[in-house]
């Protein structure tokens, strides 16, 4: 295990300015992330939440099978999933131990996993939901509809 985070792609950083403003305004302590890939956005959210709260929670939904763009580009999705796990493990070993940080990996398709969360009583639970899973229009719409049920009022 290394002590450094490793990311082989960056489809996230361009979102940081807008997300920093959202984080500063909402101050979420419970996030649902749809699409985690190697964990770059997961780490961003954890760092931001831990700057504000002593107890944080993030649920990460991803199939780690890849979308059309990953398959066409020849991504090793098993390797991507392993990198996610390594990055989260590395991050968790590096943060302030006086704070409580819960990361829940939920492997599977977002629609099924979000319905599962609803069935488990997570309706109106999350402060913020980040949707960056499938890039197919119908999938994104369904993710947004389910997210509406899972996010708390004002989130």
Q: Which stretches of residues belong to each language-model region?
A:
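S-adenosylmethionine/decaboxylated-SAM
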Residues: 3-5, 10, 14-155
């Amino acid at each position: 295990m290394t002590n450094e985070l490793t990311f082989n792609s960056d489809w996230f950083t361009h979102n940081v300015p807008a997300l920093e403003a959202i984080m500063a305004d909402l101050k979420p302590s419970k996030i649902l992330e749809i699409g985690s890939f190697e964990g770059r956005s997961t780490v961003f959210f954890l760092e931001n939440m831990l700057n504000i709260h002593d107890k944080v929670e993030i649920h990460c939904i991803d199939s780690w099978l890849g979308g059309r763009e990953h398959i066409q580009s020849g991504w090793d999705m098993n390797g991507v999933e392993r990198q996610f796990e390594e990055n989260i493990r590395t991050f968790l070993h590096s943060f302030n131990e006086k704070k409580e940080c819960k990361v829940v990996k939920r492997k599977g398709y977002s629609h099924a996993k979000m319905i599962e969360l609803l069935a488990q009583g997570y309706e109106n639970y999350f402060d913020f939901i980040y949707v960056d899973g499938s890039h197919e229009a119908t999938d994104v719409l369904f993710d947004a509809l389910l997210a509406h049920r899972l996010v708390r009022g004002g989130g």
